[in-house]
């Protein structure tokens, strides 16, 4: 025997281990899940977040370890959480965080945790909405709390919190927080813990016979909290803290004194407050320092507790200072935010094998969000993959012999070969050229332009970069992919020339026939250069107004060997003997791992990072050696020379180098009226866009204008633009250095008026320090057409680290920004005159301050206003209406938040409508679900009368918007609203079809009106006519998403030609998730040869005080034989439909006498049963509590019993049956009337048996909306709710229960 018991126990433990769920890392589940048999263990450092699983039933022990978490959350307004652990053999142990949060749901939630033991050493949170009565029970036999238990409701209802098994005991050494909750004590309370009442909460000691420890503490935190104790002869003393400011302490009986004692007394020495009902009294240790004159007898009428008239005492004074016990000092924390309840996104990498067998790695962004209905969905965006390919090289021989009016002798020897690679996301174009440049030539560089496509490359090394958009939370970051370049192993160029010109560029370049690119300058002077593809510097740009900067850096470290340069000049000519050898190569490329985020205010910020350069002197010289950051230019040129042709090819993106801004400073040694300047060339660019990649080619030349004997030093370390000066003595006006123009693609973010972020991309042209958006790529959605102009200031960081502030006019159209003009920097020279747009403030004669804008001319330091722009609007004639929320201070000093419709005319605001205050529904901060619902509000007219209006209101967070307003209601019955409805028709000879049409609602009846909808499917519409339901052949397309929904079920029973069978109709109306308009049922008896039985029915719907809706139906025969009346409620249920082992769930709102929340239906034609006269009835598989309608044979008289839960059972005669009877019982038809739950029997042949049209009663309270009508036979199904949305015990559960019961029997 002992051995057998041990075997059973071992099998039970093994079963738990097999089905156990162990969580060792963070996990998020959304939607319905089923917890099988077994324990649940969440290990340290892991969390499990279950979202929108309405029914959660733990069937094993629950163990949450330290620093672990279990979160069960509902984000649905319709379905609240139902969490249970109902087995008595398992325990609950929490050392981490357990949170059950259903605050957003508008239905009642239920938390029922039992088990053999309950131990909480961590934090547990239980949240409900409070719109309807919710229940919370932690009723384990062994109960202990040393941590935090928090019970929260948005508003107080009659629901209560129960702790421990009734008549048992609990041990509380921690903190128990109540917020808008009622704790009802039914056990002994041991320990030295604390009960804290916040908001509208009450601590109700319902059974004083069960002792409460003298070390237990009760803390009332504000004026809405209270404590009520049962008035019995057993007197106890309760430690109460925080009593005062109007909160209450009372008994369950009115406070009545005796001739010896008053109704209450306060001992100022001991601090004991005694409350009495004659001989019954209870004592409260509230502490000392209270003034007896401020005590007052009041009534505590909170819901969920006994409301005793004048049974409580309030103290209308401040709470005297008193030290709280340690347990009451544990803070009552808010309910934590569950992981996964907010829309989120993250980057993921996917590795897979393609068809060629190669491993391909893809990167993308996974976005998890919700739609308007609150349903979760996932979107994955994969970044394009960078692919490269190198083809076989080709050889090309090229020779150049150019001449111009100014000849520069050049001794050149070059042997250059390089490979060109263009990498794109889909294809690659490769060209390799071997270029031979003649030894001697006369070169004159002229500006040209060329275009580089993806299949043709002119030049040497081509750099391809790919732009990847990584989306993260409301903004977009442009990140640059790695740059790949391919060049020949030997790359050497030798040039001899007599001039050095300066060109500023730090992006990847390649060599043309007449120039050499070395780092950030191009030289055709006398020096030897060997170069290898320098990488580009980086920049970042932020457009005005709340944008995000991405700073990326890819900085090559360059080592350069620089020779000596000697120059001699005179006043009449320039002579030079310059030798400037240079050897440059990339020694290291460093790249920052993370982008930097900066948020400026209405500024454009440009950060330029220059390559790190190290120099090495290789030859001595009597002249000072130049720093690598400076280049001596134009040492042998005495006339206008065109030189230094540059061709640039690159794929531009946000990290494009801004060295092409050419913000160079000119150090000018000026003598008398002569001066020298350098004009940087204006590059021409041609771009092609392919696969989100912009490939551009620039060609430019530098034009050097000179008239003097002085040298010009172009210092790249001083990037400070200066304005162009005009001199009459100059032979040719020199343009300022900022004339260099470049084009590149950029991505920026803009903040819309509603606070959302919009990411845009486009082509930006830059001339000097001026930015112009040439083209904006089309956004994914239509942006705003509003165009505004404003003045913005931005800063530019020079190569030497200095910061330059610039200002200009920026135009904004929607989310597109364009720089219209850049203001020149201020100058002390009085001859410089500039015009710009500015904004200023003026003080009117009445002292008010007005803001104006206009065109301002600046001459030196003098400012003159040329023109003033008109104001944005003449204001007063522009009238707009919008929904707004504001706060109002009442006469008692309290602050009330109100919402309504506000009209604005100019700067004047007028409140048109104030919305009705909404019941307290605290929506968590993480909720971003938009909802639409029907609401009613009041409006005060000009004559002071109040008009009630209704309409559809859209809510996004705490913002309310009125979508439409319903026509005013009228007492006249002729006014019948119309709405689009959809219903389902099922019959015995065809499958269910769905139809929609315009339904007219008058009082509580629904009729179809003529519709112009286009026919979509072939079906039937039911219309009443002379107590007989007929069908017409027409159909309609579906209605809009805001339409109410009407579901109609129609069944046609089997009938012969001699019998007129009517359809059996049930109508269900559910317009939205928060409102129900009406529900009614239509049923008519048949006309048969033995007589007609007709019924009439009236339905009324009432709005109850608690906000729920109920429907009262009255049904009677036409001839008045019987009359029934029943009152039903609108109930929300989850329907699980099963076909054998396949089940699916559906949530409906229906009318029922009982508040069923879980209903299961099924159908099978395999099994039949025969009762009495062999009328077949269907047995439904896998459905519990199935009932078959018996058919009784009576040759003389047939009676029916009308079942009504509100009235007594009665019997009435229906019809005589002397002429017709049943012969062929196999062809009989039976179907169920969904209104009064009676069975309609139809006979098709005559004989001895039962009469046509007989009603048989089913003693069932199953909701009529979900009962099924079958053919040729049907049975009524009654179900009982079960955990996790199922009404059946699985085979595994049955086996397990049998095993446990059998084991217990053996032990006993």
Swiss-Prot record:
Lipid anchor positions (GPI-anchor amidated asparagine): 1284
Protein modification: The GPI-anchor is attached to the protein in the endoplasmic reticulum and serves to target the protein to the cell surface. There, the glucosamine-inositol phospholipid moiety is cleaved off and the GPI-modified mannoprotein is covalently attached via its lipidless GPI glycan remnant to the 1,6-beta-glucan of the outer cell wall layer.
Signal peptide bounds: 1-20
Record-level GO cellular component terms: cell surface; extracellular region; fungal-type cell wall; side of membrane
Role this protein plays: GPI-anchored cell wall protein involved in cell wall organization, hyphal growth, as well as in host-fungal interaction and virulence.
Family recorded in the similarity comment: Belongs to the HYR1/IFF family.
Protein's name in the database: Cell wall protein IFF5
The organism of origin for this protein: Candida albicans (strain SC5314 / ATCC MYA-2876) (Yeast)
């Amino acid at each position: 025997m002992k051995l057998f018991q041990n075997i059973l126990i071992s099998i039970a433990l093994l079963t738990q281990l097999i089905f156990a769920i162990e969580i060792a890392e963070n996990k998020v589940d959304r939607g319905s899940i089923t917890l099988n048999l077994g324990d649940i263990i969440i290990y340290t450092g892991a969390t499990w977040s279950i979202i929108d699983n309405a029914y959660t039933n733990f069937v094993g022990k629950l163990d949450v370890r330290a620093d672990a978490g279990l979160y069960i959350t509902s984000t649905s307004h319709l379905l609240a959480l139902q969490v249970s652990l109902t087995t008595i053999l398992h325990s609950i142990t929490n050392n981490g965080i357990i949170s059950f949060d259903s605050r957003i749901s508008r239905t009642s939630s239920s938390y029922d945790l039992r088990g053999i033991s309950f131990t909480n050493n961590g934090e547990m949170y239980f949240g409900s909405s409070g719109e309807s009565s919710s229940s919370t029970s932690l009723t384990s036999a062994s109960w202990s709390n040393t941590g935090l238990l928090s019970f929260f409701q948005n508003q107080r209802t009659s629901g209560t919190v129960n702790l421990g098994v009734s008549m048992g005991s609990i041990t509380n050494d921690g903190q128990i927080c109540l917020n808008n909750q009622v704790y009802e004590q039914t056990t002994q309370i041991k320990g030295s813990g604390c009960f804290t009442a916040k908001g509208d909460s009450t601590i109700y000691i319902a059974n004083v016979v069960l002792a409460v420890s003298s070390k237990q503490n009760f803390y009332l935190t504000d004026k809405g909290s209270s404590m009520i104790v049962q008035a019995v002869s057993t007197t106890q003393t309760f430690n109460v803290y925080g009593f005062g400011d109007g909160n209450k302490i009372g008994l369950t009986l009115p406070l009545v004194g005796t001739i010896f004692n008053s109704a209450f007394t306060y001992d100022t020495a001991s601090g004991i407050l005694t409350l009495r009902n004659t001989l019954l009294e209870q004592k409260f240790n509230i502490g000392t320092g209270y003034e007896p004159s401020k005590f007052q007898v009041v009534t505590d009428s909170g819901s969920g507790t006994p409301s005793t008239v004048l049974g409580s005492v309030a103290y209308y004074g401040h709470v005297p200072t008193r030290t709280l016990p340690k347990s009451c000092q544990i803070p009552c924390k808010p309910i934590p935010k569950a992981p996964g309840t907010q829309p989120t996104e993250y980057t993921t990498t996917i590795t897979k094998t393609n068809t060629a067998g190669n491993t391909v790695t893809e990167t993308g962004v996974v976005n998890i969000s919700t739609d308007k209905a609150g349903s979760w969905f996932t979107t994955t965006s994969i970044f394009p993959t960078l692919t490269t390919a190198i083809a076989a090289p080709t050889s090309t021989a090229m020779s150049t012999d150019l001449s111009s009016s100014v000849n520069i002798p050049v001794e050149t020897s070059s042997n250059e070969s390089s490979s060109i690679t263009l990498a794109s996301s889909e294809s690659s174009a490769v060209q390799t050229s071997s270029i031979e440049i003649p030894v001697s030539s006369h070169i004159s560089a002229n500006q040209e332009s060329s275009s580089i496509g993806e299949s043709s490359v002119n030049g040497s090394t081509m750099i391809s970069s790919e732009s990847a958009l990584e989306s993260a939370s409301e903004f977009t970051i442009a990140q640059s992919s790695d740059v790949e370049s391919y060049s020949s192993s030997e790359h050497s160029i030798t040039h001899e020339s007599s001039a050095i010109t300066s060109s500023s560029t730090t992006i990847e370049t390649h060599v043309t026939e007449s120039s050499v690119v070395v780092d950030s300058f191009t030289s055709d002077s006398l020096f030897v250069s060997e170069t290898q593809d320098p990488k580009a510097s980086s920049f970042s740009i932020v457009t005005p107004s709340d944008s995000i900067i991405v700073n990326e850096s890819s900085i090559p470290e360059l080592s350069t060997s620089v020779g000596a340069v000697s120059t001699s000049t005179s006043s009449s000519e320039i002579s030079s003997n310059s030798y400037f050898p240079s050897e440059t190569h990339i020694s290291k490329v460093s790249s920052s791992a993370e982008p930097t985020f900066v948020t400026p205010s209405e500024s454009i910020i440009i950060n330029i990072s220059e390559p790190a350069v190290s120099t090495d002197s290789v030859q001595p010289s009597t002249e000072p050696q130049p720093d690598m950051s400076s280049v001596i230019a134009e040492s042998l040129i005495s006339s206008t020379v065109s030189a230094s042709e540059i061709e640039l090819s690159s794929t531009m993106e946000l990290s494009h180098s801004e060295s092409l801004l050419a913000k160079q400073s000119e150090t000018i040694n000026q003598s008398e009226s002569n001066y020298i300047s350098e004009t940087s060339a204006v590059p021409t660019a041609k771009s092609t866009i392919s696969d989100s990649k912009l490939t551009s080619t620039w060609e430019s030349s530098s034009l050097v204008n000179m008239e003097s004997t002085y040298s010009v030093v172009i210092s790249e370390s001083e990037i400070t633009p200066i304005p162009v000066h005009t001199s009459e003595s100059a032979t040719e006006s020199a343009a300022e250095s900022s004339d260099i123009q470049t084009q590149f693609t950029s991505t920026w973010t803009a903040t819309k008026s509603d606070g959302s972020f919009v990411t845009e991309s486009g082509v930006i042209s830059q001339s000097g320090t001026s930015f112009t958006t040439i083209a904006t790529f089309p956004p994914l959605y239509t942006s705003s057409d509003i165009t505004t102009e404003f003045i913005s200031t931005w800063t530019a960081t020079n190569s030497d680290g200095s910061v330059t502030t610039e200002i200009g006019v920026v135009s904004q159209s929607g989310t597109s920004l364009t720089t219209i003009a850049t203001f020149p920097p201020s100058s002390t020279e009085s001859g410089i005159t500039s015009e710009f747009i500015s904004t200023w403030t003026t003080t009117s004669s009445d002292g008010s301050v007005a803001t104006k804008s206009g065109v301002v001319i600046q001459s030196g330091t003098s400012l003159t206003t040329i023109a003033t722009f008109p104001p944005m609007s003449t204001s007063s004639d522009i009238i707009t209406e919008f929904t707004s929320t504001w706060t109002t201070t009442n006469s008692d000093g309290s602050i009330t938040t109100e919402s309504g419709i506000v009209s604005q005319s100019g700067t004047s605001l007028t409140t048109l409508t104030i919305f009705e205050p909404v019941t307290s529904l605290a929506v968590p901060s993480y909720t971003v679900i938009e909802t639409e619902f029907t609401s009613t509000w009041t409006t005060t007219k000009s004559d002071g009368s109040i008009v009630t209006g209704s309409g559809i209101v859209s809510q996004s967070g705490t913002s309310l918007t009125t979508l439409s307003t319903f026509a005013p209601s009228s007492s006249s019955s002729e006014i019948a609203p119309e709405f689009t409805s959809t219903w389902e028709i099922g019959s015995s000879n065809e499958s269910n079809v769905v139809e929609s049409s315009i339904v007219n609602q008058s009082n509580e009846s629904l009729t179809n009106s003529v519709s112009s909808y286009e026919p979509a499917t072939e079906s039937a519409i039911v219309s009443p006519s002379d107590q007989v339901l007929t069908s017409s052949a027409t159909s309609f397309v579906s209605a809009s998403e805001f339409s109410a929904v009407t579901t109609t079920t129609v069944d046609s029973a089997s009938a012969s030609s001699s019998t007129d069978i009517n359809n059996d109709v049930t109508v269900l109306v559910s317009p939205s998730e928060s409102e129900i308009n009406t529900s009614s049922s239509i049923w008519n008896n048949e006309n048969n040869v033995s007589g007609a039985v007709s019924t009439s029915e009236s339905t009324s719907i009432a709005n109850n005080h608690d906000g729920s809706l109920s429907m009262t139906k009255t049904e009677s025969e036409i001839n008045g034989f019987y009359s029934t009346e029943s009152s039903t409620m609108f109930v929300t249920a989850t329907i699980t439909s099963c076909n054998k082992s396949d089940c699916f769930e559906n949530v409906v709102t229906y009318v029922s006498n009982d508040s069923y929340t879980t209903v299961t239906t099924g159908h099978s034609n395999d099994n039949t049963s025969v009762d009495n006269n062999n009328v077949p009835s269907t047995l439904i598989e896998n459905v519990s509590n199935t009932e078959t309608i018996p058919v009784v044979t009576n040759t003389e008289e047939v009676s029916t019993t009308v079942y009504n839960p509100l009235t007594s059972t009665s019997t009435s005669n229906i019809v005589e049956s002397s002429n017709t009877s049943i012969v062929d019982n196999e062809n009989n038809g039976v179907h169920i009337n969904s209104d009064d739950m009676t069975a309609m029997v139809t006979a098709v042949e005559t004989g001895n048996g039962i009469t046509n049209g007989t009603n048989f009663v089913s003693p069932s309270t199953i909701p009529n909306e979900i009962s099924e009508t079958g053919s040729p036979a049907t049975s009524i199904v009654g179900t009982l709710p079960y955990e996790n949305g199922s009404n059946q015990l699985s085979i595994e559960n049955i086996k397990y229960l049998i095993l446990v019961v059998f084991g217990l029997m053996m032990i006993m």
